[in-house]
Amino acid sequence: MTGPAIGIDLGTTYSCVAVYKDNNVEIIPNDQGNRTTPSYVAFTDTERLIGDAAKNQEARNPENTIFDAKRLIGRKFDDRTVQEDMKHWPFKVTNGPNGKPNIEVTFQGEKKTFHAEEISSMVLTKMKEIAEAFLGKSVKDVVITVPAYFNDSQRQATKDAGTIAGLNVMRIINEPTAAAIAYGLDKKGGGEKNVLIFDLGGGTFDVSILTIEDGIFEVKATAGDTHLGGEDFDNLLVEHCVRDFMRLNNGKNISSNKRALRRLRTHCERAKRVLSSSTQATIELDSLYEGIDYNTTISRARFEELCNEKFRSTLVPVEKALESSGLDKRSIHEVVLVGGSTRIPKIQTLIKNFFNGKEPCRSINPDEAVAYGAAVQAAILSGNQSEKIQELLLLDVAPLSLGLETAGGVMTVLIKRNTTIPTKKNQIFTTNEDRQEGVLIQVFEGERAMTKDNNLLGKFHLTGIAPAPRGVPQIEVTFDIDANGILNVTAMDKSTGKSEHVTITNDKGRLSQEEIDRMVEEAEKYKEEDEKRRKCVESKHKLENYCYSMKNTLSEDQVKQKLGADEVDNALNTITEALKWVETNQLAEHDEFEDKLKHVEGVCNPLVTKLYQSGGAPGAGPDMGAGFPGGAPPPSSSSGPTVEEVD
């Protein structure tokens, strides 16, 4: 049976999943009881780990523990931000086909290469499984959130990640818009409100200004930085500690030691969190590098000084969004803080001062608000009839201007940024030369006057134009943005009716359909491997459990007296051999563990039966859960307490 549609906030550092049921949004906890799950995937010699399990082992396996996939998705390898991030990542990123970044790991002793979409799809699969365990049903339909300032390539790549995870992505929605739903869902009446959502997460930053009235959420403007968040504050703290360690230890530089750096980063992140509630935090690391301990205390003031420039840079998109919306700061009724990094006191102070002392709204959980809104949108799109969400309407905008290159490399804009989507715009263009039989349509996004300064999304040729003097042919170009913010472009020669159509594809390092299909198959294969591994671990545990339980039972003196020392010693030797075998065969197959268990049971069960029949079971017998070890029969002895019939 298929369950309801879910909402997933696919974050840079943590992800969150929610569902709308019984007229309420439920944030779904994972198997550790946590309401957010680390966006981490780790590859070991034996298995693939996702979420908490992956993050918990990163210090001892830094090269094969992948995080920050969201900072790679939809980007090129030579992108400045990718090159900058690579300095901080312990895992290896290489230049792949079409300039697309590849992540290289060692998995089960073999070199493997993954795209960011595949890593993100693994995190999405984990979130899907968390929802399925909670709902007791399989889940297919999903709404996934992305930063409002994500460009076309990043949105499409996120949608591809959902497809690889076996999900039907009903809609990609913007994170601040989703958070606005969480804020405004229960606030009916009270007239029109201008709300500014300030969303500073682990890796991305968005500002959106919305007008909310009677369930209609209309985005007026959006701005942001897809490369600013808590990770950057961690990096600054790590760099400070590296310099401090050098100063204290005659210039010893730990930068090249990935394990030391990863341990330091974990403690820096922890210190950053502590500084949100305390004025100082201690970092203590035993034997950090070459046997040298590292201990330091960071004050909140020092941390704020280190990150001052980054903190202040968050106000630039706020000003930009206000300007684009045509509103001034006095017209904003409510400032809503979203994302874990808004817990930093300095960020809260900066915003409060910017808005002339207005207290930001803290009524929603900054970690969960985005998933909450995504779950509401998922319920609406899947036809949920709940009265509470019936009247809700989302009107979002395109974050960047879209246009094409005309003569001289000029950017001719068809859709201006902050235009409400979905939208469709067309314009007539013509040829630049006499008897020109084809035109190259190059599609760009960005705000600069010349295309060379903007972002090329894709290009295609329209051929077969009837030969004519320059300026005579009429070529109609149509830009169509769907509700996901993804662009389709059509060009048509009006005299011949010949047209070419493109959903912006591979020019920006997009995955082809063949690649997506291959990745879907591989994801299925990894899922099967994970299941196989789980069964192996279970059967290994069952064997060990049985062996230790029997060892305890048979080692008691009274048992040897009852059963005879030879038989008991033989059984104990069999158990010892089995446990030694487990030690040296940790990666054995499920069937091998099962066979070994049957062998040990074959030796021990007759003894257990004999023991119970003689009425001499010590204590309560081996603790094997329900029933007896290996199905040994229950005691049939006449000794012990008797049962009387009740009249």
From Swiss-Prot:
Q: Which UniProt keywords apply?
A: ATP-binding, Nucleotide-binding, Stress response
Picking any one GO molecular function of the record gives: ATP binding
User: Is Nucleotide-binding a UniProt keyword of this protein?
Assistant: yes
Region annotation (Disordered) maps to: 615-647
The cross-references to InterPro entries, in alphabetical order and at most eight, read:
ATPase_NBD (IPR043129), Heat_shock_70_CS (IPR018181), HSP70_C_sf (IPR029048), HSP70_peptide-bd_sf (IPR029047), Hsp_70_fam (IPR013126)
One Pfam family assigned to this protein is: HSP70
The superkingdom of the source organism is Eukaryota
Q: Where is the composition biased (Gly residues)?
A: 616-630
Q: Which family does it belong to?
A: Belongs to the heat shock protein 70 family.
Q: What is this protein called?
A: Heat shock 70 kDa protein
